[in-house]
């Protein structure tokens, strides 16, 4: 079974605190399932279930819960299993979730364990508790196959932070030429600069391809690696069940001969596997593949190699050769730590970096899969890797996230190993607070069904046109001034017009009080309102305070509002999963001062929300800033 390591650690914590059950080593959940003597189908659980597989598992579980009496410790193990699966967490929040027994069971246990979850998550949040000595050498190893996303940013910032008095390596993991493109190296470097990471040395995994090949031969000569032509599905089944490969005991000379042929582009059905322990409870040690054939020209080495090392094999060796002293990685791969040190020890490499693993950032309703994002980019569901619906750094910034806010939030999460799903509203709330002071204020209304207002004085004459300079934001005068024109012909929104009653006195913001004299309505749509100016009126006494634009001093512009990339459909079909309502566009009318707003500038449209200028006269609504209409 494949488990979420950090969530599994919580199960250890819960069972020890609540039931005095001794914590388990990896695989944690599997050992608890066996100790509690739960049915075998629980061992089929995986955090990487497809939608169909998860549905099948939940069907079995729902029936099982109906017909089984549970003690508290067994219930907590099952709860921990479900709690560790982000796909399940998202699914159970959906109102259409159909497994009644599971919903009742999970919510009951969740409420019971709420304080334990809070205690666990608070243990080291916000702290950087990584003990290191001397000059630290860290590495950030992105694969050049896409843009940096929110999941990469924490790793990049922590590596940079820990290397402040040492050395940071940006190592491009180019061990799979099928996925990699040179252009991605450039955009990753640009993204790192955006994050303020500028002191580093660039290296590549391919710098060590010759050494890695020789180390693979060394493992064969030590009897610690063998060539295997077992097909992929059978190999997966054998590793799952702890069955040795038919080729596991092939003699050294035969393995050396086959490996040599592999390197020449022959024996294409073979791979090289490390000979570790095919029955180990930690399945990462069950003879992992360390070399395989890839028929694709490499960006750097061109056609020199026909076979390439896997990341799991290359990573510890290159870390050692590059002088890395601290290897930071997300704890979902903690089961590979033992494998990491096995390679270093068997190859007698003197530099053994210290591994420190931390929890990855998981956000609600956020796609972090590079494969899925690439599908939406390649098939033009989105405009590119910087589309505001994507969780790439560029997409998030384009949606209106302030870079300093993002860095502040991530660093404040610390090096915690506790995994949790973060709600975006917390980050965007902090973002709103940080951009408020630098956001100039403007007035605007939707163009559709906008309402013309004629303003008269007490003698029923059109008022005299007045021009006035006012601050763009009264609380930050450094943003400068803008000019507003007060004349007899203005526009307000249909929504605002609908709330006004005849003879009502209300306030036009940045102007004064007005009295409704007449409303002209055609087919239920207000087309015109006659107002009487009453500047002597007290703005404190009016219920409605509305925004307006001058009819002769306006500019058309576009507002874009983005939603989540995917819908709630229970399907693995990415096209069907795409949220077709994830982008909305509207034409608005605003004061002409908006024409001078440059891209990447923050503004507030009063009584509407905060926006970021995407391009001239195009503004993106920043999430969680849409305001309730102030009456």
Curated annotation (Swiss-Prot):
It catalyses: tRNA(Glu) + L-glutamate + ATP = L-glutamyl-tRNA(Glu) + AMP + diphosphate. SUPFAM superfamilies: Nucleotidylyl transferase, Ribosomal protein L25-like. The keyword Transmembrane does not apply. InterPro entries: aa-tRNA-synth_I_CS, Gln/Glu-tRNA_Ligase, Glu-tRNA-synth_arc/euk, Glu/Gln-tRNA-synth, Glu/Gln-tRNA-synth_Ib_cat-dom, Glu/Gln-tRNA-synth_Ib_codon-bd, Glu_tRNA_lig_a-bdl, Ribosomal_bL25/Gln-tRNA_synth. One of its GO terms (biological process) is glutamyl-tRNA aminoacylation. One of its GO terms (molecular function) is sequence-specific mRNA binding. GO terms for cellular component: cytoplasmic stress granule; cytosol; methionyl glutamyl tRNA synthetase complex; mitochondrion. The keyword Cell inner membrane does not apply. Belongs to the class-I aminoacyl-tRNA synthetase family. Glutamate--tRNA ligase type 2 subfamily. HAMAP family: Glu_tRNA_synth_type2 (MF_02076). This is Probable glutamate--tRNA ligase, cytoplasmic. It comes from Enterocytozoon bieneusi (strain H348) (Microsporidian parasite).
